[in-house]
Amino acid sequence: LTDFTFMETKNGKLFTNTPNAIPGNDISKCDTSSAKFQSETTGLVDGIGSEEEILADIRSLVCMLPSNNEEDSSYEECNDDLNRVCADLANAKEDTAIALTMISDDNIFCEVKKAYAKDMVAGFIKLNGMTVGAVANRSKVYNEEAEVEAEFDGSLSADGAEKAAEFVQFCDAFNIPVLTLTNVSGFTASEYDEKRIAKSAAKLTYAFADATVPKVNVVIGKAFGSAYVTMNSKAVGADMVYAWPEAEIGMMDANQAAKIMYADADAATISVQGSAPKKPDLIFSSDGA
């Protein structure tokens, strides 16, 4: 029932059934009540850490949010130039948590559900002193040493879609504008996702379509098929849509299309037929620029 939940790592426990009550499991195998499990696997917890770390995270979050759902979006005085150049922004296309940090005032990004569904980034940034909710696809996670910690295939997963849907609904309830950075090639193809992706994608599509706050979408990479439609496209109500010059927008990824059209062909034929889609000569924003 809470909007955001934090959990202390050492002593915090959260469960419906105790780990030992789950058939075939005991706490030594998998502690389903731990902060790690609840943040990484279930997504019930937004942040974990020591008591001091949690209090610091809560302070950062509260500073981003309006006092209530009737107050205008949270503003504060800003000395960071809104039009400053982010020289390395294009290099952060894969890990959009870094990209959002770069564009935010004073490089402050308050990420929620950081450990869950890492292929989707959600959190709050400040732009010219105004709080903005940000949702972004992510294909790689880099650690502080600039090493790849996790890698994804650029598709939209069921967990990622639900994570984003819940966040967009919160932003809409509190009159917080939404920014999306889109780089998605399709839906995740796995047995786990196939059980849920249709419903999860519908939830995200509805969340964007139903939201009455300002919605801006920036296509920073691929934007293919129904997955792109789901990610705050013009078709579901985005107020403004922009695209980077190297963005690719189309009905389907060429390689995926080749697999469908040449289902009985060998791998070499599919590889040849699955050539990259031609990029448009002109990229138009929603206002025709």
Walk through the language-model features, giving the residues of each.
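Ligand-binding clefts of soluble mixed alpha/beta catalytic domains
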Residues: L1-A289
